[in-house]
């Protein structure tokens, strides 16, 4: 949708949905446009409202009015199980990241090939804010491609 208006608006920065699973940023041509024009990009939902972290064991029962009730992946037990499996694989591959392995991986994988990018993290509590403060260790291209392959296959 952003690409439809990008030449009219001519922004300095855009804020698309992008994470290891939702890749329209790449497939729409927006990533190429950002790179070609050296624009800033701030990724919205880099952990897809938490579902990509593998922290859920079952279909969550969000309270009425919680927007996550409308996100299909939260209602898909097969998807939830795959995210748990991905988390275990990541924690096994990156023991040096400790308890931050999943966040380092999810964010590092979307930032590695996007030099003008940042991510918007919605910290809901003190612990999440503390984790965010510890992030930022770079990953190799090979590690990032491995992480992406977990979520895109």
Which residue ranges define each predicted feature?
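Beta/alpha (TIM)-barrel catalytic core signal, keyed to glycine-rich beta->alpha loops juxtaposed to Asp/Glu
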Residues: 1-153
């Amino acid at each position: 949708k952003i690409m439809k208006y990008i030449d009219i608006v001519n922004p300095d920065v855009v804020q698309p949905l992008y994470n290891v699973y939702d890749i329209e940023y790449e497939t729409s041509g927006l990533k190429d446009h950002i790179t070609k024009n050296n624009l800033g990009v701030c990724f919205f939902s880099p952990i897809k409202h938490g579902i990509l972290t593998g922290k859920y064991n079952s279909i969550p029962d969000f309270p009425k009015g919680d927007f996550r009730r409308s996100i299909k992946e939260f209602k898909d037990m097969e998807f939830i199980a795959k995210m748990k499996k991905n988390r275990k694989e990541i924690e096994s591959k990156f023991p040096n990241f400790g308890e931050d392995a999943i966040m380092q991986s999810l964010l590092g994988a979307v930032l590695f090939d996007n030099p003008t990018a940042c991510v918007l993290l919605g910290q809901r509590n003190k612990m999440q804010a503390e984790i965010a403060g510890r992030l930022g260790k770079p990953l190799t291209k090979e590690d990032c491609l491995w992480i992406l392959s977990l979520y895109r296959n």
